[in-house]
């Protein structure tokens, strides 16, 4: 039973959520046996592939490198995954915008059900995932020959990014599907920890009354604690902070060691 993890990366390095996805794959490995492979699909992505090869527990890295994969267009990544999909019992991706865009396409092409945002592995075919906005946990069993899974990063502790010694193998890249084109990307640069991986989060809600109060009250505290800043949906809708601050069901899923909520009801 070999498991393929689709790496989320920026062509130069592996994003932290990939380590959580590999952790889930290693639990699958423990209950069913087999190897863990990682696919890096990008352009000029040798550095990312080399970083993936160092991840603890990974036995092989598949590198698909071509211009049509540079920006992670889902149609091209999915087609490349399909070139190797039949060799795997499980295809795993982190439940990020990237993973959620690719995994359903792979599942549709394989004519199997996708299992979304798992937080625990019970056996090789049985998983747990949150439902009803996290108020209940569903146990899901799949009889499909290939399980296509997205992993909620907060459900699994990340594996070590160093210590592995996997081989890197270049694979055939599918031709450009020509169904979409990359237009632009706006990257938000923060001096603080990223919300989804932060150990400490200071979050504000509508009770703060204004964006000015949010800045005045919360930023000094976050500075002292070296914390990430978050916000409720109500605070975002009121215009206190940008959308990428939003925490929760319709925002970012977080699992800090300390969460300080100010002016948030419910």
How would you label these PLM feature ranges?
Residues 1-266:
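N-terminal glycine-rich FAD/FM-binding segment characteristic of electron-transfer flavoproteins
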């Amino acid at each position: 039973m070999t498991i393929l993890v689709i790496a989320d990366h920026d062509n130069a390095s592996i994003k932290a959520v990939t380590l959580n996805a590999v952790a889930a794959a290693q639990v699958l490995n423990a209950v069913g046996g087999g190897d863990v492979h990682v696919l890096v699909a990008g352009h000029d992505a040798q550095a990312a592939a080399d970083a993936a090869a160092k991840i603890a527990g990974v036995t092989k890295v598949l590198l698909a490198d071509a211009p049509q994969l540079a920006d992670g267009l889902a149609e091209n990544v999915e087609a490349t995954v399909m070139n190797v999909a039949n060799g795997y019992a499980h295809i795993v991706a982190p439940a990020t915008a990237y993973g959620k865009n690719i995994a359903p396409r792979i599942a549709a092409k394989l004519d199997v059900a996708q299992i979304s945002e798992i937080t625990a592995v019970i056996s090789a075919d049985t998983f747990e995932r949150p439902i009803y906005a996290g108020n209940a946990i569903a146990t899901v069993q799949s009889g499909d020959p290939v399980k296509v899974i997205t992993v909620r990063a907060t459900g699994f502790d990340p594996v070590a990014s160093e210590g592995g010694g996997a081989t890197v193998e270049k694979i055939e890249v599918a031709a450009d599907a020509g169904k979409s084109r990359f237009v632009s990307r706006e990257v938000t640069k923060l001096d603080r920890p990223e919300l989804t991986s932060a150990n400490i989060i200071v979050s504000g809600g509508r009770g703060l009354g204004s964006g000015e109060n949010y800045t005045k009250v919360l930023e000094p505290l976050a500075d002292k604690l070296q914390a990430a800043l978050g916000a409720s949906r109500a605070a975002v809708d009121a215009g206190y902070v940008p959308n990428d601050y939003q925490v929760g069901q319709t925002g970012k899923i977080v699992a800090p060691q300390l969460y300080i909520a100010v002016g948030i009801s419910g």
